[in-house]
Amino acid sequence: MHRQLIRIACVICVMVGANQVMGQKADPAPAPAQPAARPARPTPPARDPNTAGFVKATELPDGTNPAADADGNFIIGPTHKKAAEMTVKEGVPKGTVHNLTMSSADSKIYPGIARDKGTFGTVDPADPSKLIVTTSRPTPYTRKVAVYVPKQYEAGTAAPFIVGADGPDGSLFVALDNLIAEKRVPVMIAISIGNGSGDAQGSQRGLEYDTMSGLYAEFVESEVLPLVEKECKVKLTKDPEGRATMGCSSGGSCAMIMAWYHPEWYHRVLTYSGTHVNQQWPKNAETPGGAWDFHERLIPNSPVKPLRIWMEVGDKDLLNPNLMRDNMHDWVLANERMAKVLAEKGYHYQFVFAKNAGHCDGGVKQQTLPEALEYVWRGYKGEGK
């Protein structure tokens, strides 16, 4: 039997060799399956602010903004004119911008991850709300941090400040120059923090901005703010009334997450096109809907927190931008639902529905940012007051 097996093996070797001589190659092994690429975003439809189920809102004359002291829901557009405060003005004191760099090698909280280039993930066949990502790996990063210190800042005093996502944000600094000079907002420092790279599930940015926990706020508190105070020779207030968060898209949901999980640190929130949807990764059993849970159950079922919130969404904001179809990826509906539950709980908030506006619409920001900053900072009396 043993000799027969040897003969068979020899015959096979001869046949393979003959095929190669005749120019015929053995069939190659099948290539391993490639991870799914991120799908292209579909063009969102324009949504009607008067759709049944949306919040009742006051439609303003085209080109105008809500008053800076007005709570509630408002409709603006369809044209978006740049506010005068968004332009550098001669004679207005200009703040100093310090440009810092942070490395993942120095972070105890975020050592860094990234999704392989050209990959995304696949939906769990058993759970449409869960994205399986197999191509996210430890990856180092560097981030920029731009710190705006107004000309009027008095050295040694504890200053109010605003923390912004996806920095640096030069337009914020221009607005603050003008608003501070006109005494419409306090003399504040702005800390515009770059993200750790990438976007959405499996990326460092997604981990920072979409995770429903206090971790990013803790990173800012323990790693960013001490660096800012040391390198920029400033003192930052510990008073949550003098601290604000700001962002767009996932940076907007991050702004809300920071204040929600750490209201002892932040009382003021400003968001454009907030990603209050199911984008958290990895999935967390405590908040299975990610930031969708804000309006689904967290805000409705929690005691009112001392937050003042300004928020905006565009009529052409994102709708199912990736392959997940879990009924929790509608940015317009998410922000409408946020406005509804905030009103029901009695929060001070202003919600702007912008017509003829897309996701993180630049024209809308140029029109509304000065008024949004005024609204968010309304009622601030100063350090220790």
Task: Give the residues covered by each predicted segment.
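Non-catalytic cap/lid and distal C-terminal segments of serine-dependent acyl enzymes
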Residues: 54, 61-385
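Bacterial N-terminal signal peptides
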Residues: 8-17
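Sec/Tat signal peptide C-region and signal peptidase I cleavage site
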Residues: 19-23
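Bacterial N-terminal signal peptides that target proteins for export
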Residues: 1-9
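Disordered, low-complexity segments in secreted/periplasmic proteins that are enriched in proline
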Residues: 24-44, 385
